[in-house]
Amino acid sequence: MDEQSVESIAEVFRCFICMEKLRDARLCPHCSKLCCFSCIRRWLTEQRAQCPHCRAPLQLRELVNCRWAEEVTQQLDTLQLCSLTKHEENEKDKCENHHEKLSVFCWTCKKCICHQCALWGGMHGGHTFKPLAEIYEQHVTKVNEEVAKLRRRLMELISLVQEVERNVEAVRNAKDERVREIRNAVEMMIARLDTQLKNKLITLMGQKTSLTQETELLESLLQEVEHQLRSCSKSELISKSSEILMMFQQVHRKPMASFVTTPVPPDFTSELVPSYDSATFVLENFSTLRQRADPVYSPPLQVSGLCWRLKVYPDGNGVVRGYYLSVFLELSAGLPETSKYEYRVEMVHQSCNDPTKNIIREFASDFEVGECWGYNRFFRLDLLANEGYLNRQNDTVILRFQVRSPTFFQKCRDQHWYITQLEAAQTGYIQQINNLKERLTIELSRTQKSRDLSPPDNHLSPQNDDSPETRTKKAGSCSDMLLEGGPTCASVRETKEDEDEEEKIQNEDYHHELSDGDLDLDLVGEDEVNHLDGSSSSASSTATSNTEENDIDEETMSGENDVEYNSMELEEGELMEDAAAAGPPGSSHSYVGASSRMSRRTHLCSAATSSLLDIDPLILIHLLDLKDRSSMENLWGLQPRPSASLLQPTASYSRKDKDQRKQQAMWRVPSDLKMLKRLKTQMAEVRCMKTDVKTTLSDIKGSSVASTDMQTNLFCADQAALTTCGPENSGRLQDLGMELLAKSSVAGCYIRNPTNKKNSPKSARAIAGSLSLRRAVDSGENSRSKGDCQVLAEGSSGSSQSGSRHSSPRALTHGIIGDLLPKSEDRQCKALDSDAVVVAVFNGLPTVEKRRKMVTLGTNAKGGRLEGMQMADLESHSEAGEVQPTLPEGASAAPEEGMSSDSDIECDTENEEQEEHTSMGAFNDPFLAQPPDEDSHSSFPDGEQIDPENLHFNPDEGGGR
């Protein structure tokens, strides 16, 4: 079929409206012409309801659907394409040189040629030839394979497109669902608001109705009275005047106060937008601030972990300086990403209390940390005083700024970020505490290993056994002996001199390491809390814009130019109150000569603290747990303060360490007169209680003086020493001991002030003294089994020391030891303490005239030694059961009663201390005193002399044991 015939057939199957190929063909029932459905529908609906070809009336439903026409048009298209392709092939498949049909493929040249080129052309001599049809089939096969791959790829892409379309549809549906939810929620919120409005209106309408009824009643009454006045004659008015006055009285019986109602507040809580968080900034001395070019910052406003403050230029900023008041809001701490916040700045009209005259500017801006948004031209400076915004009497301007998150969702996000920051800080604190615990455990294990490796010296007491397993039995038997009135015997644990020195050096090194760790923890904690509180000012700045509003401040927020109000550094104010008397020894700079006294006290207290560390590792672990809980409780407020008596180093530091601690304490330890006054008041109360205790002791001593005088210089075998007191006096002495222990705990409550003498050596000495009572009793039970007798004056003095004003805190003397001891052992120790005090009272608790004659074991670096003569006397009298107090030199006396807390301990001079060390080292025989874990301190009331006649015990009972 030629091209013309194909074209004529194609003309038949062409739409007579658009003259294009038929698409969804329709047939006119009148003229049988074919046309596109879209074309005829558009014609019938927009033009006329008739056929465009035959003009016959035609409706859309009358059209005939010609489904066969589409197949015919496709076949015509194929015929046209084939005819065109064949024609083109005939033109292209000819050789350009010979005009012959291309029939050969040169495999060497990769080119299609004719047979003449292959045979006679001369250009393809020796080449490999293949039939053109074969090569064509190979290429068609390859192309079809690739086409199949592309079709598969196309189908995959189509499926992906369909999946994306489904995803788009799902997203739209989800959005529509959220919109419906929001609409429902908003409708419910609106309904709740309508309910609130209805309730408020019901209340108001009830008030209005009662008032309206009363006004209508009064109006009708007035009209009636006026009518009577106009219409009645004089006689009638006189006769009705009583009735009218009675009506008036009835009206006045109801007071006006009954009509005064409580106004209904016009506020409705929004469930979508949070309320504003506001703060007020009062610019005092405004005229003086105008003369400066520096900005003024308001106190910080903490909102959900964000720190906001107002930045005010009293004389204007930039080009408006001298003309306008510039006010900006700064985000000094918060989330790292940019967030939008709504803010409002209000200047209060001070001439009257009308809030409608306040200048209010509000806007919403995107804030970053350190960025300022506000108003460069907030208000004209020349109109401040004239308009009433500047109080000329006080020279003040009051600004109120408010800020909020746009939605509750953003506010919850800010709070979640703040909680994350706090949890991270808490994790850091816990990690540091665990590190300190590990260090403490390592040091304690190292000390225990060194103690186990060094062999004990059993030269004097080879059968000494003071293991922890036998302490319970010893305490019980010793308490029974004290209750029976028998003599108290105490054995002295003896160790080598080099072992004592090694343990003291290790303990002092441990104190230094622990103190440095605690100090690092304290300082790091303060820095992190300062960062969380947002009190640190940001130094970042952004570009400025001198537009009318929403100007970004450009000036650098330097700390030197900031005029701070109400102490922007919050932690500095907190440290002023409780660091005046809590610094390490030698670091106080508030008093003249305090450093010298504190250094001497540190020397006296070093051995006492070392002995406390050697007592039991569980005690220190428990103390550190207490500190851990205390720091967790104070995490949101003040910094954790470790216990000064144990966790703060009391050993003598090197000069370099002292200088470093002085520099660290200079900026955080100012003097505080209020704290000193409070301290003096508490010390006066403690002195009063001590006077009461002394009075009671004097009464009991007077009642027992008859029994003690009868036994002067007699050491017989009868039991007349304590039986003369009778059962009543014995019970009274026992009750007195319990009362004295109770009063000592009360005195410890008064002394327990964390800001007063935290690091006093007396406190550590009293701790060791109170704990040494149990050690002395344990050693006494051990020595009683061997027939040796020693003095219990050291243990009893430790008990009396705990009742003085230098007693240790209750958390150390009662809480910790009570937790470590079993219940049965605790009850035995209580009876033991009370009986030890009874024996000390019965013996008069004599004192020595000089302070250096008092027993203070553990204060010497090498440990207290017993003199040879005193030990010989002790051995000579031990057979008869005599107990004499041994007083080695180098001990310090107890404080006098009238001395204040700052001058309680007046230690010996350096020369005297040297003499003491010289005299102590002069002995060849190493008579060792109690080791550091059992040392104690003795203190006696002033004015009483020591006398062997007052120390009588029953020798029979002691010898029998």
From Swiss-Prot:
Pathway: Protein modification; protein ubiquitination
SMART domains recorded: BBC, BBOX, MATH
Posttranslational modification: Auto-ubiquitinated.
Regions of compositional bias (Basic and acidic residues) in chain numbering: 504-514, 776-787
Annotated positions of the Phosphoserine modification: S454
Tissue expression: Highly expressed in testis and brain. In embryonic tissues, expressed in epithelia, including ducts of the developing pancreas, epithelium of the midgut and nasal epithelium. In adult, detected in the central and peripheral nervous systems, including enteric ganglia, retina and the adrenal medulla (at protein level).
Annotated residues for binding of Zn(2+): C95, H98, C117, H124
Domain of life: Eukaryota
Coiled-coil region: 132-234, 419-450
GO cellular component: aggresome; chromosome; cytoplasm; cytosol; ESC/E(Z) complex; perinuclear region of cytoplasm; peroxisomal membrane
GO MF annotations in UniProt: chromatin binding; histone H2AK119 ubiquitin ligase activity; protein homodimerization activity; transcription coactivator activity; tumor necrosis factor receptor binding; ubiquitin protein ligase activity; ubiquitin protein ligase binding; zinc ion binding
Annotated positions of the N-acetylmethionine modification: M1
Disordered as annotated region, ranges: 447-514, 529-561, 645-665, 776-811, 874-961
Function: E3 ubiquitin-protein ligase required to prevent centriole reduplication. Probably acts by ubiquitinating positive regulators of centriole reduplication. Mediates monoubiquitination of 'Lys-119' of histone H2A (H2AK119Ub), a specific tag for epigenetic transcriptional repression: associates with some Polycomb group (PcG) multiprotein PRC2-like complex and mediates repression of target genes.
Protein known as: E3 ubiquitin-protein ligase TRIM37
